[in-house]
Each structure stands twice: as structure tokens, then as C-alpha cells.
Amino acid sequence: GVFELEVANSLAGGELTFRRSPLFGLPYPAGSEILLEGTLDPMELASEGPFFDLLKTYDAVRAQPVLTVQRAHHRPGPLFHYIMPGGMEHQILMGLPREAKIREFVGNVVPSVRGVYLTPGGGTWLHAVVSIEKQRDGDAKNAMLAAFSAHPSLKHVVVVDPDVEVTDGRQVEWAIATRFRADRGLLIVPGAAGSTLDPSALSDGETTKMGIDATYPIREAEKYKRVDYQS
């Protein structure tokens, strides 16, 4: 597996220092405000919730392992940093690693991936926009399937050409309006495993996924060119 403290240290330029916890001797960042030491028994479960989650809807009550805290340590006047559910910080922590994974998986089936964006409107979880440079018209559908494989919770994905900025919702909508035709570019995947956070899914997360090919046909590129002007 990946040791998360090593990743954090790399992101911090190797400047983090670590100490060993008094009770268990496990490493922790030396500048921590609060340190909790305890045990997590996977067989001891308790109901958690309901509370609102990433999608700003109430999540189902779930049975989760119980943490038994044995010692608590803190600095004088410690600061407790709280991440608000559904807020931008929560969305970045959840979505950013998935964007990287989607880019990796799509890159395995399409020669050139230009951009991947999990949209804020989809909670940076359910909706993605992927920009590719097609070599053949089937590349867009392969990109959709790869995106769904990379991020199983993904519900809808739109594939666009490199001239469409994935982070600009107006441009993405324009691509759907002018380049998408449902009889040739719509992919429906019924009975797929999705996100249990999605209130429209079944209790086990089963849902129907949708892919939209908003790229233009390669042999008709001239017809679909966007005029570059500023009003």
C-alpha cells in the first residue's frame, strides 16, 4: 500500500518532521494540534448518521467500525480543523484523486487525453467531462467506458474535443448542443454499480449510467469548427 505520511511529506517538499506516539509508537506529524490514540475493531459496529454528505443530501444510516480512544494528546490551546460536508474542501479531497485516476484509465485506451474535470454540480463525484483528441470516432465511447471503470461512482460523463474547455460549463453545453446527436452518441449502461451517495440509485448503489459523445465526427471536422471571435 501507500504510506500517506510519505505522500504528505513529498507534497510538503520533504520538510515535515515526525515523532512516535507515546502509547503505540506510531509516526505522526510533529506539528499536530491533536493526537488521538486508540483501537479500531472491524467487528464492533455502530450506526452512523444520518448526516448530509458530499452531494449535500442526507446519507443513509450505515454500520461503521467503532473507534475506542485510549489516550488524547494536544498542544496548549489546540486548533481543531473541521471539514464541512459538501463544501469545497470536501469536494477537492474526494474528487481530485479520482480525476487523476480517470485520466490514467482513459489514457490507456485513447492516445491523447487533454483534460478531466469532475464538475462541482455533480459534487465532484457523479459527473465528469473528459477532453480527448480522437484518432477514430470510436475513441469517445472507449473513453466513456474507461472513465466508468476508473471511478465506479461516476454516473454521467461527457466527452468533448480539445477545443472545448472542460471546466467551462457554457462551452461543454455548447458542445452538447452542436456536436451531440443522441442516435449515435448516447451510451446507456443500465443495472450498473454506482454511488450509494446518489439518492436516485437503489439502496446498494445500482443505477443507470449515461455517456454523451459531444465530439464531432472526424471526417466532418470543418463543418463543426467554432468561429474564434470576441464580441
What residue spans do the PLM features occupy?
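Charged, compositionally biased interaction regions
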Residues: 1-231
